[in-house]
Structure formats: C-alpha cells, structure tokens
Amino acid sequence: METAEAELRVVEAVRALLEEDGLRGLRSPRIAERAGLDLPTLYRIAPTPVAALRRVLRHIDGLVLAGGPGEAEDPPRDRLFDVMMRRYDALVPWKAALRRMARTLPPDPLLAFGLALALERSMAAMLEAADISSVGLAGALRVRGLCLVHADALRAFLDDDSEDLSATMKVLDGRLRQAERLAPLLERLDPSPRTATKVGAAPMHQNRAEFSVSQSSNIN
C-alpha cells in the first residue's frame, strides 16, 4: 500500500472514531482496525493517538495550501481571511467529529500541550500561505495571535450551520480587524523586508473577499 493512501486511511479512521466516541475512542488499536492497517504500519505513520491528531492537522493544512496564497495586491488581512475561510471549508466534513471532540476533551496537560504545538505549526503555515511572515519575534507573536483568532472563529464555526458559513465569516473578520491594529507594533519589532512565500493558485472564494471589503466600507 502506498504511504499516501495509508495516511489518508488513518485520517479517515480518526474522523470516524471521533464522531462515535470522541477522544475516548481514539486508541491506536482502534485506529489501526478502522484504517485496515496493522499496528507496525500505523506506528510508522502515527505512533500515538496524539500523533494521529497531528496527522489530521497536516492533512487539513495540505488542503488549504493547495488553494494558493491569494492575490498579491490584496491587503494582508484579506489574504489571511481567504486562507482561513478555506480552512473552515476543509473542516466542514469534520464538524461532527470536532463537536464530539470538544465535548469529550479530557483534562490532560500532555494532550493539550501536544495539540497546542501542532496548532501553532498549522497557524504558521496559514500565515505563510497568506504571504505573511511567521519567523522572528514578530512572526511568533503573529502565530500566537492567529491561534487566538482561530479559537474564536472555530467556536463560531461549530455552531454555524449556514451553507455559506456567514456567522463564521463575521467572527473571523472581526477578530482579524482587531488583530490588525497590532500590525504597526509588530513591524517595529521585525522591520526586515518580507520574503514572499509562493504557494500556487488564486483564492477560491471571491464572495468572501467581497464580504471583507463590504465590512470595511460599513466601518468606514
């Protein structure tokens, strides 16, 4: 079996188990059984349940990055808005699993720490996909800030059953505008020129760019 196919099987097995039993059901033997893999193969892909969750995050990251960085002439906030909305699009099939996971999240510091590190890597990738630096002190602060933005937007996403995710867009847009006010401070912390990160194609959601522009005109 090809590695990519085995990895995808693990991702789908994690989703199914989370939907059924939340984190309580996420055990390596169950993941292997659901994925149709033996334990040694699973171990090479995801040696622990936390590693399997990190594998899921990388899978979602890949789906988002495939959409490209957006239009270079767009403001950074608009590029990041588009990238993050692509992330929530990719998470739509995971909504039931995420809801169940949120209800069954145990008070486990090691689990929380492992997932927090993985989330920071994902948010750094989202910034880079939007051609915003994630390196240096300013980059680290941007990553941490985007984690907070994502936490609020994800809560809205889990309660948002609209087809266009309008409630999610509203929260995300508002939080990004709040974060944007810190941009001058971050530039003073890290004044070096930004080296562009080229990922690929054009943005997927023109209507979402229009949403952001319309919100800006309403505020002004």
Go through the PLM ranges and name each one.
Residues 3-14, 31, 56-60, 64:
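Generic hydrophobic, amphipathic alpha-helix propensity
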Residues 109-132, 140-154, 170:
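Amphipathic alpha-helical packing segments from all-alpha helical-bundle domains
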Residues 128, 159-220:
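C-terminal peripheral helix-coil segments that are non-catalytic and often amphipathic
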Residues 30, 82, 86, 100, ...:
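Amphipathic alpha-helical interaction segments
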Residues 68-103, 107, 117-118:
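Hydrophobic alpha-helical connector segments
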Residues 52, 56-63, 90-97, 118-125, ...:
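Amphipathic, well-ordered alpha-helical segments in soluble domains
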Residues 9, 17-55:
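Helix-turn-helix
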Residues 13-17, 90:
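Short amphipathic alpha-helical elements of helix-turn-helix/winged-helix folds
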